[in-house]
């Protein structure tokens, strides 16, 4: 009986951790931490952008393919066959930082455009959403207003 209580307590702690890493503030903290490292001002949560992200994430539940929405916002997508927190998704995008060469304003050695969208100086409003795919995986989208990643422009 004592062991099952411990197991239940651990499960609740893990559930709380997973929920905490998916709040608007957690998405903002992950983005703003990366932005601060390159002296870019913070983003703020925008309910209109978040509603757009939620609507699109719900459309992707059936197949969870990494297909961009084609909407009016900048967009980063993430998918995992297991559970993925919003914070972990942002950290995946930020992990592309070593591939961005500021001097040539290009990606070298791999993908970097998810990272450059995270730190795009003019993108100041953020909205993100996470859904559980019908297949059991996780789909996450973050949308940015105004969008970034314009050709021949530096993110900061």
Tell where the protein language model's regions lie, with residue ranges:
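Cleavable N-terminal signal peptides of Sec/SRP-targeted secreted and luminal proteins
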Residues: 3-20
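Generic alpha-helical structural context detector
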Residues: 54-58, 79, 91, 95
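A structural signal for short loop-to-beta-strand junctions that line the ligand-binding cleft
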Residues: 65-68, 78, 115-119
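Disulfide-stabilized extracellular recognition modules
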Residues: 73, 83-156
């Amino acid at each position: 009986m004592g062991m099952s209580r411990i197991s239940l307590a651990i499960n609740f702690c893990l559930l709380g951790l997973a929920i905490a890493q998916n709040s608007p503030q957690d998405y903002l903290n992950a983005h703003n931490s990366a932005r601060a490292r390159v002296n870019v001002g913070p983003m703020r949560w925008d309910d209109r952008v978040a509603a757009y992200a939620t609507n699109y994430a719900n459309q992707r539940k059936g197949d969870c393919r990494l297909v961009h929405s084609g909407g009016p916002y900048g967009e980063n997508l993430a998918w995992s066959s297991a559970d993925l927190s919003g914070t972990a998704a942002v950290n995946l995008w930020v992990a592309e930082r070593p591939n961005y060469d500021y001097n040539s304003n290009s990606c070298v050695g791999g993908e970097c455009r998810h990272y450059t969208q995270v730190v795009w100086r003019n993108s100041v409003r953020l909205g993100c959403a996470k859904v559980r795919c019908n297949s059991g995986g996780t789909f996450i989208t973050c949308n940015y207003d105004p969008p970034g990643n314009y050709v021949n422009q530096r993110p900061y």
